[in-house]
Amino acid sequence: WNYSHRYPKEFDHWKPSLFGIENPAYTDLKLKPELNNSYDNSILYTDWFLSQVIGTLKSTNQISSMMFVSDHGQTLYDGTCNLAFHGHNTEYEFHIPAFVWYSDIYKFTYPEKIQRLVRNRRAKLTTENIFHSLLDMANIHYPTERLERSFFSQKLKKEKRYVDSYGWSDYDNASLKGDCREVIDKGTPLHQEK
């Protein structure tokens, strides 16, 4: 991926970047500064965009909330690791950014949800928690809901966190191997159906 394609020119803040480089060889370690700077610029643009969304929500003076969750992390030649992008089963790819924003009116209307959100802020979660948390955040209830997976709920339960690393590996029972911090299950990973 050419990260410079993910932001407009006015967000090309950190340089040198991949901006203007046609078909860069992403595996060329000589382009590490350009790759990392372009990635950081794309995050700068994402932050700006999210701040615009939050500003719009704030201006409505309504009960409002927003959740942001990335789909995966990235390995970006971190330290002495010579890998980039994702699909390498590294710790960098399994840790993802996420946050919740809520209006003052939301906090006033649902103080117990905010208390539980704060209490659960250090819980070990997976993206499997997102669907259930989004519905709970929106106060949407249904007969088969699973509040034990919502980080807005007092019923939140710790569950095994499986990641796709040579089968379904128990992330919390894994060791981190090598400079790239590759996730290796200490036990036997669950078989994946193809």
Residue positions per predicted region:
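Catalytic domains that recognize anionic headgroups
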Residues: 1-194
